[in-house]
């Protein structure tokens, strides 16, 4: 049945006409319907469906949907977003009317016709959730399917990259603050102790404390901004950190160095998203373009007729809009200039195939299988040629051509097999630009194109220069400045200096104030009290035990506070550096995604259609991280060294001699 006949039948919407439509013979298996020069648009088919549904003619409405599905396959349209949004609107109306099953059917139809539209998947998830407990798992699957289907699309990939970039920047900023705060609490007293020793007893504690605060807040005091404080603190304390803490600090400094390129790439994508021609090209590649899109592409072709990419996009847009005659004329003009143009030859043959001109299509497909053709072109030509043989019931030739296509490009042919009619027959496939080609063609341009004739082998300009330019910023300068600061602090302390916190009482001690050799990270009194177990008077023992108890209580309280406020920071404070960093990455990563989605939304699904699973999953992940961070804590910072062997008394040694 031709599309024009179907449209006429649907527009009449009378019982007699509907009955007559049922009696019209459908094409035999393997024979594709022919297309007129101007086929029905999807707007016309959708209007026919709406009228049939409003008239209560279920048969005509079903026929309209089948024709929409058939036309989508014939024109190789990945996602009918316009029709999908119409079905989503109907599903929402059914949900408001408490007609859950009808709403589910509408959303399923939207998912089938527009798999790249997240609204249909979200609406289906909401409708399934209204089933009750038995609809929970299918609802989660529908929501996950919506994300996985939208992600490969042009808009989905662009939104995902923007969301990931913003979330990564926010997460690194939060992690840097948490790590700097934990290490400041853990190691800041060592710097304060060295300042005390450097100023001497004549200056008093208040002078060293004031100098300590001035050093910590120097970026704010010099009007550089409070955002630099985490990296400044890490550089200031770098000489006091152990190797694990230094490794984490270096990772954060490297992340700061990557801020410039990340922001530059985000700016490039945002400039691309402001290009109206980019959105027109994207619609021509993965949707059914409307008249405005076609007009914009026609204007672009008129301004640059030598850019074949724009010509291919215009031809694809015209064919997917049902304007077969105009699309054929576009390809004929290309072939008049270059008879060997593989894209124009294949796509013109597909239009002839849709019109029933199998012999002329066969001749053009065979030209594409000649020696010297690119593998993807030859595989596509063999694949389309096999369908011509199938129309003629030439099964041996069909199998031979299909085998050649599978041999040349098995992955490509497997992708082509998704274009399958309800009758289980396959559709011929166009050649042209992919989503990735469209992204590269318009990358970084707010108007016009960035690369001409990408399909002819032109490559995008190298972004090495732009990457190098993005590294010249304050963040790169800060890395050098902080390296200099860490070096100066190390030179100020001296090469043989050490400053430690006693692992038991928490007292800070250094080379100047410590007598004897350091063993096990303990001060002299704790070493004699807990290891030698001798040489400490009773009152001193009692005072030291009270200090140990206060230090343990202080460490436990600080661990709880840090873990409650910033899960993972407590582990960093108590010495589980890498485990704490992993918890911080999970905590701030989830939080950053939630915040970034408000700034650069991944999808445009309205809130009323958004299922609760993604926020609920994020909440459960945050709860799990918080529970783990507060449940598991490190033991003491140090283990006591072995007790030294007692020396034999001189008298006993002489008697033994």
Q: Predicted segment positions?
A:
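Boundary/linker segments of alpha-helical solenoid repeat arrays
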Residues: 72-80, 116-123, 135-138, 145-161, ...
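Transmembrane helix recognition focused on a "late"/terminal membrane span
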Residues: 449-495, 499-504, 519-560, 578-657
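Membrane-interface segments at or immediately adjacent to transmembrane helices
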Residues: 60-73, 264-355, 360
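Hydrophobic alpha-helical transmembrane segments in integral membrane proteins
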Residues: 242-288, 490-497
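Hydrophobic/aromatic packing residues within the alpha-helices of TPR/SEL1-like helical repeat arrays
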Residues: 65, 107, 143, 297-298, ...
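Register position in tetratricopeptide repeats
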Residues: 96, 130, 320, 354-355, ...
């Amino acid at each position: 049945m031709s599309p024009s006949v179907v449209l006429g039948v649907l527009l009449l919407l009378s019982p007699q006409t509907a009955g007559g439509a049922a009696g019209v013979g459908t094409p035999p298996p393997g024979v594709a319907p022919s297309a007129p020069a101007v086929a029905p648009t999807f707007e016309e088919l959708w209007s026919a469906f709406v009228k049939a549904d409003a008239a209560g003619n279920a048969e005509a409405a079903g026929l309209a949907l089948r024709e929409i599905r058939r036309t989508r396959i014939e024109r190789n349209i990945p996602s009918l977003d316009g029709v999908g949004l119409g079905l989503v609107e109907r599903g929402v109306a059914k949900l408001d009317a408490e007609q859950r099953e009808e709403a589910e059917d509408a959303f399923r139809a939207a998912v089938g016709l527009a798999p790249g539209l997240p609204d249909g998947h979200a609406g289906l998830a909401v409708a399934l959730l209204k089933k009750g407990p038995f609809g929970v798992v299918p609802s989660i699957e529908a929501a996950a399917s919506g994300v996985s289907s939208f992600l490969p699309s042009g808009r989905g990939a662009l939104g995902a990259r923007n969301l990931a970039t913003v979330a990564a920047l926010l997460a690194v900023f939060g992690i840097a603050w948490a790590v700097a705060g934990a290490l400041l609490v853990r190691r800041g007293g060592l710097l304060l102790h060295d300042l005390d020793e450097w100023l001497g007893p004549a200056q008093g504690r208040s002078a060293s404390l004031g100098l300590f605060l001035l050093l910590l807040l120097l970026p704010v005091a010099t009007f550089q901004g409070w955002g630099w404080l985490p990296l400044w603190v890490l550089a200031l304390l770098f000489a006091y950190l152990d190797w694990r803490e230094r490794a984490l600090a270096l990772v954060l400094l490297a992340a700061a160095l990557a801020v410039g390129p990340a922001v530059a790439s985000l700016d490039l994508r945002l400039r691309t998203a402001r290009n109206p021609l980019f959105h027109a090209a994207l619609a021509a590649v993965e949707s059914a373009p409307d008249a405005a899109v076609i007009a914009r592409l026609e204007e672009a072709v008129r301004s640059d007729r030598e850019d074949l990419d724009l010509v291919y996009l215009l031809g694809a847009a015209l064919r997917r809009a049902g304007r077969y005659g105009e699309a054929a004329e576009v390809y004929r003009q290309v072939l008049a200039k270059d008879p060997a143009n593989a894209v124009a030859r294949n796509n013109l043959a597909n239009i002839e195939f849709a019109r029933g001109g199998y012999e002329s299509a066969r001749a053009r497909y065979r030209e594409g299988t000649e020696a010297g053709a690119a593998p993807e072109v030859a595989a596509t030509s063999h694949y389309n040629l096999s369908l011509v043989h199938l129309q003629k019931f030439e099964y041996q030739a069909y199998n031979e051509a299909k085998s050649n296509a599978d041999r040349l490009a098995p992955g490509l042919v497997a992708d082509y097999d998704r274009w399958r009619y309800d009758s289980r027959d396959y559709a011929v496939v166009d050649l042209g630009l992919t989503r990735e080609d469209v992204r590269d063609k318009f990358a970084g341009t707010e108007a016009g194109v960035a690369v001409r004739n990408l399909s002819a082998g032109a490559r995008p300009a190298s972004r090495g220069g732009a990457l190098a330019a993005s590294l010249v910023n304050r963040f790169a300068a800060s890395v050098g400045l902080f390296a200099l600061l860490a070096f100066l602090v190390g030179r100020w302390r001296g090469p043989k200096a050490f400053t430690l916190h006693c692992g038991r009482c928490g007292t800070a001690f250094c080379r100047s104030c410590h007598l004897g050799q350091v063993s096990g990270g303990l001060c002299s009194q704790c070493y004699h009290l807990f290891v030698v177990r001798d040489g400490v008077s009773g009152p001193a023992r009692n005072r030291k035990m009270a200090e140990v108890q206060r230090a343990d209580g202080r460490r436990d309280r600080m661990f709880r506070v840090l873990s409650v406020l910033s899960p993972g920071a407590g582990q960093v404070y108590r010495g589980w550096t890498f485990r704490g960093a992993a918890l911080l990455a999970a905590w701030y990563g989830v939080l950053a995604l939630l915040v970034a989605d408000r700034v650069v939304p991944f999808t445009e699904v309205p809130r009323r259609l958004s299922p609760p699973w993604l926020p609920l999953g994020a909440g459960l992940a945050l709860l799990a991280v918080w529970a783990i961070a507060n449940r598991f804590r490190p033991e003491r910072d140090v283990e006591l060294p072995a007790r030294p062997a007692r020396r034999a008394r001189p008298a006993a040694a002489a008697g033994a001699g």
